[in-house]
A protein has these predicted regions:
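Acetyl-CoA-dependent GNAT
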Residues: 3-92, 96-98, 109-111, 115, ...
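Short, Lys/Arg-enriched, disordered terminal segments
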Residues: 1-9, 119, 159-161
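Active-site beta-strand termini and strand-to-loop segments that position acidic
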Residues: 68-70, 158-161
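Conserved GNAT acetyl-CoA-binding A-motif
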Residues: 117-128
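Conserved active-site alpha-helix within GNAT-family acetyltransferase domains
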Residues: 106, 131-149
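Conserved beta-strand-loop-alpha-helix junction that forms the acyl-donor binding cleft
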Residues: 100, 126-137, 153-160
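Conserved G/P- and acidic residue-centered "switch" motifs that form tight phosphate/ATP-binding loops
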Residues: 103
Length: 161
């Protein structure tokens, strides 16, 4: 039996090598406009890394992690930290289509939660989800997130205490 190694790496949208790799991966994942809309509703198709960075990654309080299976990146998540409120906002969670519904998104969110609890002493997570993205809503609810507001998008929160 071939056991695959799962690991997590922190990447930066200010590092040119990371940007090059992320551009290749995200361009592939976002070749479907529906996937881009579910992940980042404010971004227009086709995906452009420069627009992605300028709209979402100019704040220095953003941390991004990728999930690797063996040496292949199959997942991405970002969070914006608010140290004053001891909270973080999750965004841009995506798993490569071939690896969806296998628990990798759950592992990626749990990894981020543990980082926040252990190292940063944060106690609250929030996120927004597109209403039509039922699989994401089910994932977040299974992880203990609660719906706090429904408008154009669904706002969810989770206490980490």
């Amino acid at each position: 039996m071939n056991v695959q190694k799962v690991s997590f790496i922190e990447v930066s949208y200010t590092n040119n090598d990371d940007i090059r790799i992320l551009n290749a991966i995200l361009s592939s994942w976002f070749s479907d406009p529906k996937i881009l809309h579910f992940t980042a509703p404010n971004h227009q198709y086709p995906f452009k890394i420069s627009k992605w960075i300028s709209l979402s990654y100019t704040d220095q309080n953003i941390i991004t992690f990728c999930l690797k299976l063996d040496n292949w990146i199959i997942g991405h998540i970002s969070m914006k930290l608010n140290a004053e409120e001891k909270s973080a906002h999750l965004f841009h969670l995506i798993i490569d289509e071939k690896y969806r519904n296998k628990g990798y998104a759950k592992r990626l969110v749990k990894h981020v939660e543990q980082k926040l609890i252990d190292k940063e002493k944060f106690n609250r997570l929030s996120l927004n989800c597109v209403k039509k993205n039922q699989s994401a809503l089910a994932l977040y609810q299974s992880l203990g997130f609660s719906i706090v507001k429904e408008k154009k998008h669904i706002k969810m929160v989770k206490d980490l205490k």
